Swiss-Prot record:
Protein name, per record: Palmitoyltransferase ERF2
Enzyme Commission designation: 2.3.1.225
Spans annotated as Disordered: 1-55
InterPro entries, per database record: Palmitoyltrfase_DHHC, PFA4/ZDH16/20/ERF2-like
Subcellular location: Endoplasmic reticulum membrane
Catalytic activity entry: L-cysteinyl-[protein] + hexadecanoyl-CoA = S-hexadecanoyl-L-cysteinyl-[protein] + CoA
UniProt note: domains: The DHHC domain is required for palmitoyltransferase activity.
Biological source species: Yarrowia lipolytica (strain CLIB 122 / E 150) (Yeast)
Biological process, per Gene Ontology: protein targeting to membrane
Low complexity composition-biased segments: 1-14
Length: 408
């Protein structure tokens, strides 16, 4: 079929010439079909577009993303740490053994046993308030576990201070290394500098370290996690049961989880004992006879003690180190930043003064234990000043902060 072409010469067309034939929708439709086919062939020759992937591939990359199937559109797709992102980057977890799923299953099974064997009789014969209070504590436990396990612990953005000289171990001229301090530590892949010095004492120093893996100067009390391969702000520890780091952003949820988990265990023990005693009185039996008729409360007592011991021990330990203004990482590694002893009391460094809200470099912790604990567990996590961007740079440098993973 021949198609209309514009005239090559000027002047009005003559009557009966092809130029004088009017162009209708029917005559232009084949041209439109040919143009679309031509565009599809051209796109196919250039390669598949990122939006032309199958629905199953796009759904899989949105639900469980390990490696991006196309060029990264969000910062979490260009993230270089050892993390797995879920539901379009809204949740994250370490790329280790998923023990957090096993812990969640144990919690749900223990709650299911309580609701199946102890709660119905307690609701009908003692008081409905007892299972209702347990439900509230149990929901707090599950919610705190999910928030601590799948949320951002305070991961610091990468590739901010791209200095090859620092990564090689050489120090720029604008910095000076304190005498007696090894500048470059190849075992930890860090470079240490004495950055701040308090005027009250020349011995109380706060050190900055350059992480050669993340290419950033870590702020005070931040540390690099070898399991997650990330620098975490106020890094406390890496919890294998959560399969995530515990840092500034999820520390309170971790403490809330272990506290409510221990309370659930003790609540199950107390309710099961009350169940046995009330059933004995109601049926006019001895304790041995009531246990033969209903042996499940005895099993729940054992499981409750087993599930409450370890969480309550963790609660006591973290309340103790929180009262000292320390983290688990600082307590285990004996960090000199937090281990200056003055008159038998641990001195407060510059970073601890920020936690306590005090500028006294040697304020005793015994005078403000409650203030330190409240500041550590209840302090507001300030929002980041940098805007949360949607797309990454062509080099994959992460400019935004970790406020929302779905836009990180």
């Amino acid at each position: 079929m021949d198609f209309y072409t514009p005239p090559t010469t000027a002047g009005p067309p003559t009557r009966g010439s092809p130029e004088s034939v009017p162009t209708t929708a029917a005559s232009t439709f084949p041209l439109r079909k040919r143009t679309r086919a031509h565009l599809r062939a051209r796109d196919k020759s250039d390669g598949p577009a990122p939006s032309s992937r199958g629905t199953s591939d796009r759904l899989w990359s949105w639900v469980f993303l390990k490696q991006p199937l196309s060029l990264p559109e969000h910062n979490y797709q260009a993230h270089l740490g050892n993390n797995v992102f879920l539901i379009g980057g809204r949740f994250l977890s370490a790329r280790q053994k998923p023990l957090n799923i096993a812990v969640l299953c144990v919690i749900l099974i223990l709650g299911g046993l309580y609701y199946g064997f102890v709660a119905p009789w307690t609701w009908n014969h003692i008081s409905p308030a007892i299972p209702a209070v347990f439900t509230y504590i149990f929901l707090l436990c599950v919610a705190s576990f999910l928030r601590a396990s799948f949320s951002d612990p305070g991961i610091l953005p990468r590739n901010i201070h791209l200095t090859d000289r620092i990564a090689d171990g050489s120090i720029p001229n604008e910095y000076s290394v304190e005498p007696g301090i090894d500048a470059f530590d190849p075992r930890k892949n860090t470079t240490s500098l004495s950055c701040f010095k308090q005027p009250e004492s020349s011995e109380n120093l706060v050190y900055l370290k350059y992480c050669s893996t993340c290419k950033i100067w870590r702020p005070p009390r931040a540390s690099h996690c070898s399991d997650c391969d990330n620098c975490v702000d106020f890094h406390d520890h890496h919890c294998i049961w959560l399969n995530n780091c515990v840092g500034r952003k999820n520390y309170r949820y971790f403490v809330a989880f272990v506290m409510t988990g221990g309370l659930c265990g003790l609540y199950i023990v107390g309710n099961s004992i009350a169940h046995v005693i009330c059933y004995k009185r109601h049926m006019h039996m001895t304790i041995a006879e009531s246990l033969r008729h209903r042996p499940m409360p005895l099993v729940m007592i054992f499981l409750g003690f087993l599930g409450a011991g370890y969480p309550l021990a963790l609660v006591g330990f973290h309340l103790w180190i929180a009262s000292r203004g320390e983290s688990t990482h600082e307590f285990v590694s004996m960090n000199p930043v937090t281990k200056h002893v003055v008159d038998g009391h641990v001195g407060v460094t510059l970073s601890k003064c920020k936690v306590m809200g005090s500028h006294d470099g040697f304020k005793r912790f015994s005078d403000a234990v409650l203030a330190v604990v409240c500041a550590r567990l209840c302090a507001h996590v300030s929002p980041h000043s940098n805007p949360v961007t949607k797309q990454t740079t062509p080099q994959g440098v992460q400019k935004s902060t970790f406020r929302h993973w779905k836009r990180f």
